[in-house]
């Protein structure tokens, strides 16, 4: 026992007293700061987040199936270009077909003495010329003349020649589409000549006189439109001569 007392005395520090152990210590004196701490468990917190997300996902749907509560907001692209077919322009407008301008150009050709509107005639409109070319070929077909290839070939060569000639004569220049449009619209009187060829034969004095009048009508209308669109004052006769040569070929196809 004496050895044990010596051991205890040697083990503790000299300033430490065993009697101090009898004094009680209040763990609650420090408040929540000295409360019991548990070790960190990352899986427990992760499980809490998962349960919270599951509770949020399992909330009942308060809206209706066919009437969702959240409205659709279009993107910036859809706001600019439109998201429905109602916002799109008409198909004829996208193709560049304007029936008002087609009618005005047709009236300009049918009235040779009428002043042509250069702003309208300077447009590239090939819808009317294509219709008139098909109508001219159809009337020739009714007369027993299958000349669609000649009509298209002569039209292409004539438009190309007039395009080169007008670019040399005018100061502003002209596009190939504008030349084709004007020459195609001025083909309308030639359809009248081919229609007469269906009713009676044009191989005579009456046919020659009628063909000459139609050629003068077509060439005068075309030259008037070119002069108005290209501001070529005083050069109408110079423009009318090659136009008369072109429409003379169509007249020969209609008569013979």
UniProtKB/Swiss-Prot annotation:
> Hey, which stretches end up on the Cytoplasmic side?
1-125, 169-172, 217-235
Compartment(s) where it occurs, according to its Swiss-Prot or TrEMBL record = Endoplasmic reticulum membrane; Golgi apparatus, cis-Golgi network membrane
**Coiled coil location:** none
Record carries keyword Membrane: yes
InterPro entries per UniProt? Yip1/4-like, Yip1_dom
Q: Primary place of residence?
A: endoplasmic reticulum
* TM segment ranges: 126-146, 148-168, 173-193, 196-216, 236-256
Of the GO CC terms on this record, one is: endoplasmic reticulum membrane
Source organism, top-level taxon: Eukaryota
Topology of this chain in the membrane: Multi-pass membrane protein
Q: Name one GO biological process term.
A: vesicle fusion with Golgi apparatus
Q: Which family does it belong to?
A: Belongs to the YIP1 family.
Q: Tell me, what does this protein do in biology? A: Plays a role in transport between endoplasmic reticulum and Golgi.
| UniProt protein name | Protein YIPF5
């Amino acid at each position: 026992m004496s050895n044990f007392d010596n051991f205890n005395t040697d083990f503790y520090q000299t300033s430490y007293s065993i009697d101090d152990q009898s004094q009680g210590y209040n763990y609650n004196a420090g408040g929540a700061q000295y409360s019991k701490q548990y070790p960190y468990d990352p899986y427990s917190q992760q499980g809490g987040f998962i349960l919270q997300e599951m509770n949020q996902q399992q909330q009942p749907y308060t809206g209706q199936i066919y009437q969702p509560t959240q409205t659709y907001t279009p993107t910036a692209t859809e706001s600019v270009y439109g998201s429905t077919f109602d916002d799109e322009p008409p198909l004829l407008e996208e193709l560049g077909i304007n029936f008002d301008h087609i009618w005005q150009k047709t009236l300009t050709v049918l009235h040779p003495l009428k002043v042509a509107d250069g702003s309208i005639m300077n447009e590239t409109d090939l819808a009317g010329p294509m219709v008139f070319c098909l109508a001219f070929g159809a009337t020739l077909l009714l007369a027993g003349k299958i000349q669609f290839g000649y009509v298209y070939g002569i039209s292409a060569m004539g438009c190309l020649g007039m395009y080169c000639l007008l670019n040399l004569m005018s100061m502003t220049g002209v596009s190939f589409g504008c030349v084709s449009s004007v020459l195609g619209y001025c083909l309308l009187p030639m359809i009248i000549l081919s229609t007469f060829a269906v009713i009676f034969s044009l191989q005579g004095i009456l046919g020659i006189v009628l063909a000459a009048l139609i050629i003068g009508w077509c060439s005068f209308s075309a030259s008037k439109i070119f002069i108005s669109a290209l501001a070529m004052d005083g050069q109408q006769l110079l423009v009318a001569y090659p136009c008369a040569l072109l429409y003379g070929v169509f007249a020969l196809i209609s008569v013979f």
